[in-house]
């Protein structure tokens, strides 16, 4: 009976540990142990996507390579006639407010009612916020 109890206790103690290692393996780029099962030969055949560089050189090369005869928006790389015509990068979740003098800002809709971002900007400009 003590062997059965020992086996059950060991199973209960090691299962959470194995689950934790699977979590860390997936968090830090592993395939949940699948890479070891597939072998190294298969790993070389499959090309993994790489993250975008963390420095600004990728963005700068995109900016410099963009074709635009008017104004190139720095945030979206859209070509527009005037800087305040630049679209928001995330139009589905951002509203744009023009401040005058060719300046426009984008802000999160944040679940407010339509036009609420513009009202808050106006209140802030008047010093009421």
UniProtKB/Swiss-Prot annotation:
| Keywords noted in UniProt | Signal
Q: What range does the record give for the signal peptide? A: 1-19
Q: Where is this region: Disordered?
A: 32-51
**Is RNA-binding given among the entry's keywords?**
no
**InterPro entries named among the record's database cross-references:** LCL2
Keyword Translocase in record: no
Give the domain of life: Eukaryota
The GO annotation for biological process reads: ERAD pathway
Q: Which family does it belong to?
A: Belongs to the LCL2 family.
Q: What does this protein do?
A: Probable component of the endoplasmic reticulum-associated degradation (ERAD) pathway.
Annotated protein name in UniProt: Long chronological lifespan protein 2
- Taxonomy of the source species: Eukaryota, Fungi, Dikarya, Ascomycota, Pezizomycotina
């Amino acid at each position: 009976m003590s062997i059965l109890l020992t086996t059950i206790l060991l199973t209960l103690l090691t299962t959470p540990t194995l689950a934790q290692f699977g979590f860390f393996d997936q968090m830090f780029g592993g395939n949940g142990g699948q890479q070891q099962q597939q072998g190294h030969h298969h790993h070389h055949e499959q090309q993994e996507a790489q993250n975008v560089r963390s420095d600004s050189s990728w963005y700068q090369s995109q900016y410099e390579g963009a074709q635009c005869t008017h104004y190139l928006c720095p945030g979206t790389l859209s070509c527009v006639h005037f800087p305040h015509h630049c679209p928001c990068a995330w139009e589905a979740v951002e509203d744009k407010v023009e401040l005058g003098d060719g300046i426009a800002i984008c802000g999160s809709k944040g679940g407010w009612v339509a036009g609420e971002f513009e009202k808050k900007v106006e209140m802030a400009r008047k010093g009421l916020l």
